[in-house]
Amino acid sequence: MWPRLPGAGLAPQLRRQDQRLHFTGQMSHGLQMAGPQETVLALPLREGVQAAATVPILLYNLEDGLSDHPLDQGPRCPARRPCSPASAPAPTSPKKPKIQAPGETFPTDWSPPPVEFLNPRVLQASREAPAQRWVGVVGPQGLRRLAGELPEELEQEHLDLDPKRGLALPEKLFWNTSGLSQQAAAPEFSWGGSGSYFNNLDYLLQEKREQALEQERERLLLQECLNLNSLDLDEEEVPLTPEHRMLVEKYSVSLQTIPPVHPGETVFLPRCHPLPCILDSSLLKPRSHLEGLFLSSPPAQQLSFLRSGLLNILYLHMPDCPVSLLQWLFQLLTWPPETSLGAFGLLWDLIVDGIFLQPDEDKHLWCPSLQEVREAFHSLGAHSPALYPLGPFWHGGRVLPGEAGLNENEEQDAPQEIALDISLGHIYKFLALCAQAQPGAYTDENLMGLIELLCRTSLDVGLRLLPKVDLQQLLLLLLENIREWPGKLQELCCTLSWVSDHHHNLLALVQFFPDMTSRSRRLRSQLSLVVIARMLGQQEMLPLWQEKTQLSSLSRLLGLMRPSSLRQYLDSVPLPPCQEQQPKASAELDHKACYLCHSLLMLAGVVVSCQDITPDQWGELQLLCMQLDRHISTQIRESPQAMHRTMLKDLATQTYIRWQELLTHCQPQAQYFSPWKDI
């Protein structure tokens, strides 16, 4: 055999390496310029390999550092060189795909970029990136570890390319490093470094399912909360021991306070439909064809005449308007607002025209009678006890037309407070116009009955929080029209004091009369004193006809207004024998006594404020201040368990301060010594 030369074994190996370089170069260029179908080979690569492509890797000579065969060992080069894209051999293929240069503005690869936030591997890659940046500087030992971490699919693929299994590791490393160098040469906005990110519809569907599950859990939790709120906790209540009960009663706060609004009375019952109003045209003679058509029409068409304004053309500016038409319009004031507004406007214009068209000496205007006013209130839903109360003006057992039709079946839908207030406002304004235009239209008995009726109906529960300006103006006019004034004052005060049995309602009734005229001031003072005497059972001790004795009478009644005396006065029913209910009954009795004392003290303040305090009455007012402080202020023992006591004591303090201010303004003049008096 021929002797083998020392370098003869290197030529075939170099040729094989050159072929492998050419093959890997083509593969790397193919990976760079491939479309969406050709990027499947780059998908299994790990993120660490791609991160290493961006850092220059210092390598030993692959031939020196990886080959242990004695024939493959040649002269070693001591210097290290970086592995870069320039060191890779140029491929010999004539059709070389164009690679995008780093300086180009637009990419040559227009394939859609991957949506990185849809891939769940992004967070894992971001956590692993800092540790993998140092792969390029660890030398051959790191490359061996890197080669050992390659996926098994990639190893199997490169082993199939070469039949010699023993050279799989060098070829694999060399192919990997050349591919990394080609990826490092790609620009930042190309496909390099993002091979692991791709659109994943399964992840979107999974996220949608998770959101649906969260919404279902939230719905179930809300249902459980509703079920917890609807549980009957009384079944789980355990009776407290005496020690626990005493502890709870010691630190419990009572919710019973003195209400700022009066409770009211049930006056207007609900009606489903208003009572029918029929125009009595039997005595009317038509003066025109249009009027004859109106009088002969059914009630529904007559209302259409009113809404269309034809009645204004027929009866406006006429000297003698039919009384039956005025009565029909007055009853229509109780209908819903869309009808009552037109009726009120026409009725007002007709009365005003009558005032200006008739001469002063022969002026006669139509005014609704007391009975017609009661019928109007009955049409609004007022029941008979409110219209015909037991008292000085009891009218017997007469039943108004349509009274039998008012039953419980018709009381289903309560009338709206606003609609009721609008109808009452129309009635108040029209009555005020009549009282102002013709003061002598009503007698004193009718005036007092009308005042009582207005005060009684105004205490309705639905009207408590609504303003009553029109009512107050009407009451002032009715008081001024009473001819026997001060003779009717005692009778009027006694009548009004029985309008309600509740002290707070009577206090609200006193406040219906504004403190504006001398008659209203005197009525407020006398009525307040009568209500105080009635609540204390001392009606016989009041000389109502003597105005100057009101402060002295109030001084005697103030001593009976202490809470302890009121508690004894209200304790007509003995406490229940059960000891468990005795503390509760005692607390309710204390609240009632303080509530009554609060109303009586408010009425006492009205009595004093309506007086014209003179220097002669300075001593009586000073005595009232002393009794207020002695019988009420010092008798109230505040407690966190009884807020009504605190409210009563606050009112007593405010009243005392107000009376002290009056004392400073009406203090009598001091008598000074004059040595020249007897000269």
Swiss-Prot record:
Residue ranges, annotated region (Disordered): 70-113
Pfam families associated with the record: CANIN
Record-linked InterPro entries: CANIN_dom, FAM178
Start-end of Low complexity biased regions: 75-90
Family per similarity comment: Belongs to the FAM178 family.
Full protein name: Protein FAM178B
Species, as recorded: Homo sapiens (Human)
